Amino acid sequence: MQFTGAFTAIVTPFRNGRVDEERFRELIEWQIEQGINGLVPCGTTGESATLSHDEHRDVIRICVEQVKGRIPVLAGAGSNNTREAIDLTRFAKEAGADGALLITPYYNKPTQEGLYLHFKAIASEVSMPFIVYNVPSRTGTNICPETLARLNRDIPEVVGVKEATGNLIQVSEILEYCGTDFQVLSGDDFTVLPLLSVGGCGVISVTSNVVPAKMSDMCRAFKAGDLATARRLHFELSPINRAMFLETNPIPVKTALALMGRIDLEMRLPLCPLQQVNQSRLRDILAAAGIL
């Protein structure tokens, strides 16, 4: 399975404290209509940290059901508890997801050996494609290129990484050590085009929740060798990318989708509504981009 192009780290809509299945299905359909290449439910943007285990499973199930095989579904299934990650990954496979996005264990701060053994343990019990999710700003631990190379060499299930450091030196080293068949996806919307230029294959995007066509078109243009179009779209996306991170993700992106009329503005504590000054900035940026 190739995970290439623009994948949306899709939000989880809530209504009255519960997952809003109707709006979620509508969002999925809109994403597909807009040409997105794949979807990632239950990631950071999907507020996986505040979903119950039953809700987590429901969100994956709904996403797979609604997609109906039209595009790949890469299900968020990671945990800092290895046994829990195994259970979530097993469910993702049974539900029909095409792969699992597995965050490096957070809070525990494992060594590189601990990271290696974590992913090895998951693969020993569930055989499906894994994308390792490296986001040190949230986990407190960076998985090194050498460790990824070891995983890639020893564990066939580890087919790529979502690299959210924005560090192009690290991206280059990953591709150098793992080879160009290893799938490196950007986890940083600001550096998608530079990552593609050194051999990355796509992005797992926050911004594409709002502008799926623009993000996927940029990836397609680059793949087709149309660098002028890719560069133009990169700069058109830049102010929207900044807007999506005015405050902690997914607060701005859920606010944007609510302004667009696509979801209710509801998130779970400890996330809270966007500050008024940032709401005004967000609205202005979206209006200038023709989104509102």
Curated annotation (Swiss-Prot):
Cellular component, GO annotation: cytosol
Highest taxon of source: Bacteria
Catalytic function, reaction form: L-aspartate 4-semialdehyde + pyruvate = (2S,4S)-4-hydroxy-2,3,4,5-tetrahydrodipicolinate + H2O + H(+)
Main location: cytoplasm
Active site: Y133, K162
Entry's EC annotation: 4.3.3.7
Keywords tagged on the record: Amino-acid biosynthesis, Cytoplasm, Diaminopimelate biosynthesis, Lyase, Lysine biosynthesis, Schiff base
Residues reported in the UniProt entry to bind pyruvate: T45, I204
Any GO BP: lysine biosynthetic process via diaminopimelate
Biochemical pathway: Amino-acid biosynthesis; L-lysine biosynthesis via DAP pathway; (S)-tetrahydrodipicolinate from L-aspartate: step 3/4
Gene3D superfamilies linked to this entry: Aldolase class I
PROSITE patterns: DHDPS_1, DHDPS_2
Transmembrane segments: none
Sites annotated Part of a proton relay during catalysis: T44, Y107
One Gene Ontology MF term: 4-hydroxy-tetrahydrodipicolinate synthase activity
Purpose: Catalyzes the condensation of (S)-aspartate-beta-semialdehyde [(S)-ASA] and pyruvate to 4-hydroxy-tetrahydrodipicolinate (HTPA).
Family annotation (NCBIfam families): dapA (TIGR00674)
Name recorded for this polypeptide: 4-hydroxy-tetrahydrodipicolinate synthase
Organism in which the protein naturally occurs: Nitratidesulfovibrio vulgaris (strain ATCC 29579 / DSM 644 / CCUG 34227 / NCIMB 8303 / VKM B-1760 / Hildenborough)
Originating gene: dapA
